């Protein structure tokens, strides 16, 4: 809840910065999937379809260190970013994560985890086009 409130407070500044970052062509795409092995296996068709629709774009995947091996030989991923959840806990960790995303200068960010801090990190990381799976806190995800 704290991260949502913080996002509302700084969103005018972030929207202004996003206005200056928008580009017409898509060069870099980030997919965040830091869940378990089964979730990553089920989301590999997403990588294929994105690469099919954006063949010239560089596709990066942000995954756990335990699931990195599943994507190492995947022809649809150009870069694999390995993260540890312990390194990104707390406000400092979330700011470090958004800084990592900002340095990547991604045009599209897709968060496949129903995890609010990762979805907000795309906004804090100044990704112009953001897609995310959001939980509704009643046990269902939409």
What are these regions (language model features)?
Residues 1-142:
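Catalytic machinery of carbohydrate-active enzymes
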């Amino acid at each position: 809840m704290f991260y949502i409130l913080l996002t509302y407070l700084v969103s005018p500044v972030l929207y202004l910065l996003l206005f200056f970052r928008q580009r017409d062509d898509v060069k870099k795409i980030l997919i965040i999937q830091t869940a378990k092995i089964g979730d990553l296996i089920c989301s590999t068709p997403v990588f294929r379809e994105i690469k099919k629709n954006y063949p010239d774009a560089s596709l990066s995947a942000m995954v756990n260190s335990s699931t990195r091996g599943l994507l190492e030989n995947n022809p649809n991923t150009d870069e694999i970013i390995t993260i540890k959840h312990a390194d990104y806990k707390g406000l400092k960790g979330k700011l470090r994560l958004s800084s990592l995303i900002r340095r990547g200068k991604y045009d599209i960010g897709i968060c496949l985890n129903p995890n609010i801090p990762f979805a907000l990190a795309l906004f804090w990381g100044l990704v112009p086009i953001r897609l995310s799976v959001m939980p509704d806190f009643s046990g269902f995800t939409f």
